[in-house]
UniProtKB/Swiss-Prot annotation:
Proregion span(s): 1-21
A Pfam match: Pribosyltran
Binding site for Mg(2+): S329, D391, D392
Keywords on record: 4Fe-4S, Allosteric enzyme, Glutamine amidotransferase, Glycosyltransferase, Iron, Iron-sulfur, Magnesium, Metal-binding, Purine biosynthesis, Transferase
Entry keyword Zinc-finger: no
Pathway linked to the protein: Purine metabolism; IMP biosynthesis via de novo pathway; N(1)-(5-phospho-D-ribosyl)glycinamide from 5-phospho-alpha-D-ribose 1-diphosphate: step 1/2
Protein name from the UniProt record: Amidophosphoribosyltransferase
């Protein structure tokens, strides 16, 4: 049942923090309870979307079973509604709306009936050409029932590409045809009668990775068979007891079914790949790996680089100063800053991780508490100390301003803010809710004006050069991170992604305004 109550704490958070659109998960394993595995996979991806979620399964009789709902994964699903989700494969989704309203009708998976059976789809990202593609389809007489990009994708996949036999599914050709029309930004999983396809756009803008698990054979439990999973982040692979294989490559189509796994190039990968750098800064869980490196380690390097670029003021010493981070995503950067600067790291804030999605409306008194319901200072650690407060980003500055007031109220004598990313100057149009130009404080004010607004003694950001150095230094080519042949060719194929001249292979448009593809908004 959809709950339309507004949440004041969630609204407060949305005013201050960028939001990832979605998390996707898929598994093919007829021997297992795939809906239950998908459930735990989605729990691991909960941080990527908290508005709605859903699971769909395909059974041996070619029937699709689906359950969606508004709220967190463990609020929507239980033993009763998981039990009917029988099947040999499953796809799942956690959603935060950046294209389409936050309503149950826009929850995923989306199921569509085609001439070749039902298909289900889950997607992360925004189509940068959604407007023109929607218009093109409507001119052909196609109607739309929801305002999410995923319906555009399903309609394109339902249409038979020119030159293909309309009596055959040709899913690989259909997907490649869709990819030819949509450069970015998407990572999606498509469930068909013939298995699951994982698809990543040619820029690699949204993450998608591949894992495997060994399961007992149905006919002979003493033997095992390898099955496969696809997911937005590797943390979900570990959660279900699977083994990480590799990232899905830009432009790649990965097909998992009864016969195992095959791989195709759906669209030639770009010479300038553009994985969203905010995956490293904020979105991904610290225990996930991308491009062969652990997110936690990258964030710690960001903190170390930040300390070299913007060291503590000379008035601060390791006797009277502490480094604290804003829980949770900023803690690795704070640890790195402390390590490099020699100023001790201390826990200064605790976070209530369970209140931001409550639908219980607060009294006027509690509403006035604002940020205090989400964060609480450790007064004994802070009182009488100079504080270096490390956060991962400033978007609108509402949260950081409130936290500074909270920390000062706990007895801090000085507060120096250090941000482990550059100023956010431009909105994102590729799957992240990052406000508009009018709402971005970095676009409208100087660093000094922001410092004055938030009430800090000093404010300094990590440079773009420092950010990219922290990210790029640990990237491992696919050939180093995995030697498993997953391509349809007879020998293993590796694709070394080209790095352009300034060694920048990530989307940094929110910092520079240089978008990696054309937009038709």
């Amino acid at each position: 049942m959809e709950n339309n109550n507004n949440n004041f704490i969630e609204e407060e958070e949305e005013l201050s923090e960028p939001k990832e659109k979605c998390g996707v998960f898929a598994i093919y394993a007829p021997e297992l309870d795939v809906s239950r595995i998908a459930f735990f996979g989605l729990v691991a991806l909960q941080h990527r979307g908290q508005e709605s979620c859903g699971i769909a399964t395909y059974d041996e009789f070619q029937s699709v079973h689906v359950e969606t709902g508004m709220g967190l994964v463990n609020q929507v699903f239980n033993e009763t509604n998981l039990k009917p989700l029988k099947g040999k494969m499953a796809i799942g989704h956690t959603r935060y709306s950046t294209a389409g309203k936050s309503t149950l009708v826009n929850a995923q998976p989306v199921i569509v009936q085609t001439l070749h059976g039902q298909i289900g789809i889950v997607q992360n990202g925004n189509l940068t050409t959604a407007k023109s593609l929607r218009k093109e389809l409507m001119q052909k007489g196609v109607g739309f029932f929801i305002d999410s990009d995923v319906e555009v994708i399903t309609q394109l996949l339902s249409n038979n590409p020119e030159g293909c036999d309309p009596h055959k599914p040709n899913w690989e050709n259909r997907i490649a045809h869709f990819m030819s029309k949509a450069e970015a930004a998407y990572a999606l999983c498509l469930m068909t009668p013939n298995g699951i396809y994982g698809v990543r756009d040619s820029l690699g803008m949204r993450p998608l990775c591949l894992g495997s698990l060994e399961v007992p054979c149905k006919d002979d439990p003493t033997k095992t068979i390898t099955r496969y999973v696809l997911t937005s982040e590797s943390c979900a692979i570990g959660t279900i007891g699977a083994k990480f294989i590799r990232d899905v490559r830009p432009g790649e189509i990965v097909h998992i079914n009864e016969n195992g796994i095959t791989s195709f190039i759906g669209r030639s990968p770009s010479d300038n790949p553009a994985l969203c750098v905010f995956e490293y800064v904020y979105f991904s869980r610290p225990d996930s790996s991308m491009e062969g490196q652990l997110i936690h380690i990258v964030r710690q390097r960001m903190g170390e680089t930040l300390a070299r670029e913007s060291p503590p003021p000379q008035t601060c010493s390791n006797n009277d100063t502490i480094v604290i981070g804003v829980p949770d995503s900023s803690l690795p950067a704070a640890i790195g800053y402390a390590k490099q600067s020699g100023i001790p790291f201390t826990e200064g804030l605790t976070k209530n991780r369970y209140i931001h999605r409550t639908f219980i409306q607060p009294s006027d008194h509690l509403r006035q508490q604002g940020i205090k319901l989400k964060f609480n200072p450790l007064t004994e650690n802070i009182q009488g100390k100079k504080v270096i407060l490390v956060d991962d980003s400033i978007v609108r500055a509402n949260t950081i301003k409130a936290l500074i007031k909270l920390i000062r109220g706990a007895g801090a004598t000085e507060i120096h803010v250090r941000i482990s990313s550059p100023p956010v100057l431009h909105p994102c149009h590729m799957g992240i809710d990052m406000a508009t130009y009018d709402q971005l404080i970095g676009h409208n004010r100087t660093v000094e004006e922001i410092r004055e607004y938030i009430g800090a003694e000093s404010l300094q950001y990590l440079t773009l050069e420092g950010l990219m150095k922290s990210v790029n230094i640990g990237i491992k080519p696919q050939a180093e991170t995995n030697s498993t042949p997953c391509f349809s060719t007879s020998s293993p194929t590796t694709t070394k992604i080209k790095i352009n001249e300034n060694n920048q292979k990530h989307c940094v448009a929110c910092f520079t305004g240089d978008y990696p593809c054309s937009l038709d908004f």
